[in-house]
Structure formats: structure tokens, C-alpha cells
Amino acid sequence: MFKSSKFKGKKACVLGMGKSGLAAARLLAENGFSVLISDGGKREIPGNLHKNIEVETGGHTNKILDCGFIVKSPGISSNMPVLKKIKNKKIPIFSEIEISISFLPKGCRIFAVTGTNGKTTTTMLLSEILKQFIKNKEFNKNVFTVGNIGCPLAEVMSEIKQHDLIVMEVSSYQLEDSSYFKPYAATILNITPDHIDHHGSFKKYLDAKSKIFKFQTQKDIAVINSADKNCLKAAKNIKSKLYGFATTPLQQIRSHVFYDGDELVFSAGERISPPKLPGIHNVENAMAASLLALAAGVDSQSIQQAFNKFKTVEHRIELLGIKKGISFINDSKATNIDSTIIALRSMPDGKKTWLILGGQDKGSPYGVLLPLLETKCKKVLLVGQAAAKIKKDLPGYKYFNVCGTIDKAVEYAFNNAQKEDIILLSPACASFDQFNNFEERGKFFKQIYKSL
């Protein structure tokens, strides 16, 4: 657990000069710490850095080993040689969220959302619910939406006041690095194999996700998907008050909310219509957000009002429009196989979908896609570094076309698709082979759509 008073006078080292690393460095510098930012890549050093911040790029020097504590950016592999040196010297390592939380004003409550899929949508839903509740009750509070969603907590720390609410999307990378993280209310939406290339095994990935509940007490709230066996494992020994949701009929008996095909039905008697978003996965996201809110004292009217106003999340099964009778759907946020499965389940049967698949491989097998490809897809257009592995993992599927890049895939699909067909970008892979992030990939797809 990071306490600034314990490390007073000691130099901090921030490993990685990404968005969260820079935000953590600035926060520490503004609170009197001398900071070394060390980045292994050849990055451009930002202007207007605080006078207490020193930067080294292009490699990690032994200056790191003279620091009193380390802040590890979430994308950095735990197997890096420099981290082994740090651990051998027993220098404490913290995550950006741990550092940031230590500077939070009194009375702030953290609502944390994790899961393999659905994190961003659920985070946004919960934020809108809390904002609506505060507006209805005329409370003098603000809601800050932070974390893996794109805005580090450290970046907005100067704006946060006592008793404000923090809604945080938390990734397995962030949880892995946290020695102490205690949200007031937290949910695990689902857990399926992902990021195995980073964590090394599914067990380590599951262990990282499970840390969201680890330090909670009986006064805290935990929400899980009762139909997900891995979520049940993650919640096995928790101390917090546990709530469950499920769309699967067999699991409804041990859930606090289920879906009757029309409304969310809560064990306390409330009935709420879910937001108008495609797919059963979004019903589950709405269940998780509403359970967190209800358990924290939010009324059902505020939840319903927020759901009625809610619009789809950018880059997640996002309908861009229709051209020549062909629908274009941007699901660039599908950076793993399970996300693509969810997207394909949302598509109509009858082989009308032209699926753009591929990018940077993350180590999971693609064979599980076969049943959906056979029932939903007219053709699969392969792009990026993972193309060869996808073909190898799906020897029984014949309708591939290797396009290499997204623009070529769209051109091929648009020239061959018929009225009422769908061109779906849902890559099931990371974007880093051709783009900086999934947002950039999604925006590129949107630009192509607009240019047709």
C-alpha cells in the first residue's frame, strides 16, 4: 500500500512514458517528489514537464536502482530484465491507480469495473446512472469516469473534491500491478481467456482479475456474473457483500437480478427496462451497472432515466450507417476472440456478414469461432499479422480472403456485397501491428466508410 508520507524525500521512478505514466509522474512531482521517467523506446519528450521530472528514453539505466519506489505503467511486461533487477534490490513497485488513490480527498468512493468484455459499456452506464442520481437528488458531488477507459485517475486528481464519486474501468494489467486496491463497489462481468501473451497463463490472468475484490471488507459491494464459472472462482473467498446477475435461466435462482426477455427483474421487486443496445451481452452490462448502483443506494427511477438516455459506446458494435443497402458496423474494440463472438451473435443468421478479422495475435486459439463463421458469415477477410495463424486454427473453414489491410478488406467487401449484407470490423486481435490503439483502428475504418 502506497503512503506518500512513508516515501517522503525518496525519488520516484515511473517506468513507461505512456498516458498513465506521464499522469502519475506529474501527480508525484506536484506533490513534492523528484521523479525519473524511464522509457525503453525512443519517444519524444513532452514539453512543459514539471521541474521535478527527469526523463530517459531509449533504454533503462541503473539510475532506476537508486530510486526509492517504482511506478510501473500497465503495459510493461513483468518479465522485463530491469524489473528483475528492481525486485532483486527489493525496491517497492506500485501501479498508477495505487499512487493516485493515495492522494484522493476524504470521503470519495470508488466504483470499479473489470471483465474480459463489456468493461467500457458498463463503466459508461454506471457513470450515467450516478450522474442522474446526483442530479435528481441535487447533491453537491461530481462523478469522474477514469482508468482503462482512456483517462488516468492521476490526470484529473486536481479536480476531485471530498465525497466525489470515481467510476473506474480497470484492466488485468492494472490489477496485476496493484499491491493494494480497495474499491467501495466492484464488478467482474465475465472472465474468458485473454492477454495470455502478457500474463503467461490463464491462471495468472484469473488471479489478476480476482484482485479487484481481494481487499474489500464487509462494508463493500461485489457484483458478479452468476453464470460465469470463472467469476464464481474469483469471488470464492471474498469478504464483501456479494450480488449476482444472470441471463441464463438455470442461474437465476442464485441471482439478485434476471432478464425476463423484456425487463430486468430484481429480487427486491424493482423492474427496469434495459438500454436500447444490441445483444444479450449489453443486457448483462446493464444488470451489472444497475446492481452496483442499487446496492450503493441509488433509486430505480434514476437508473431507468439514465438507461433511457444512453447511447452506444464508440467502437463497440457501432452502426456507422448504410451505403447501397450495405450496413457498416465498427467493432474495433473487439481485441479478443470472445468480443468477436459477442459481435457475431448480434448479427443476423443467413450468412450476410463480411467479417474483417485479424491484427496482432494475443495467443488465444481461433478455432472456437468456427460455428459462428459457418452460420453468420458470407466471407472472412483477413488482415494484419495474425492472418496466417487464423487460417491455421480454422482448417475446416474455406471462405477466407487475405486482404492484408482494412482498407483493402473494405474495398473487396463493398465491391462484392449485396443489399442487406453487413460489413463488420471485429478483429479479435490487438491493433498494434498497424495502429497505435483500437481507437485509431476504428477511426480509420470510419474514414474509409465516409469516403465510399
UniProtKB/Swiss-Prot annotation:
GO BP, sorted A to Z: cell division; cell wall organization; peptidoglycan biosynthetic process; regulation of cell shape
SUPFAM superfamilies: MurCD N-terminal domain, MurD-like peptide ligases, catalytic domain, MurD-like peptide ligases, peptide-binding domain
Any single GO CC term annotated in Swiss-Prot or TrEMBL for this entry: cytoplasm
Domain of life where this protein originates: Bacteria
EC number(s) given by UniProt: 6.3.2.9
Catalytic activity: UDP-N-acetyl-alpha-D-muramoyl-L-alanine + D-glutamate + ATP = UDP-N-acetyl-alpha-D-muramoyl-L-alanyl-D-glutamate + ADP + phosphate + H(+)
Keyword line: ATP-binding, Cell cycle, Cell division, Cell shape, Cell wall biogenesis/degradation, Cytoplasm, Ligase, Nucleotide-binding, Peptidoglycan synthesis
Pathway noted in the entry: Cell wall biogenesis; peptidoglycan biosynthesis
Compartment(s): Cytoplasm
Enzyme kind, highest EC tier: ligase
Pfam families: Mur_ligase_C (PF02875), Mur_ligase_M (PF08245), MurD-like_N (PF21799), MurD_N (PF21377)
Residues the entry annotates as binding ATP: G115, T116, N117, G118, K119, T120, T121
InterPro entries attached to this UniProt entry: Mur-like_cat_sf (IPR036565), Mur_ligase_C (IPR004101), Mur_ligase_C_dom_sf (IPR036615), Mur_ligase_cen (IPR013221), MurD (IPR005762)
Annotated GO MF terms: ATP binding; UDP-N-acetylmuramoylalanine-D-glutamate ligase activity
Function summary: Cell wall formation. Catalyzes the addition of glutamate to the nucleotide precursor UDP-N-acetylmuramoyl-L-alanine (UMA).
Protein family membership: Belongs to the MurCDEF family.
UniProt xrefs under PANTHER family: UDP-N-ACETYLMURAMOYLALANINE--D-GLUTAMATE LIGASE (PTHR43692:SF1)
Name of the protein this chain belongs to: UDP-N-acetylmuramoylalanine--D-glutamate ligase
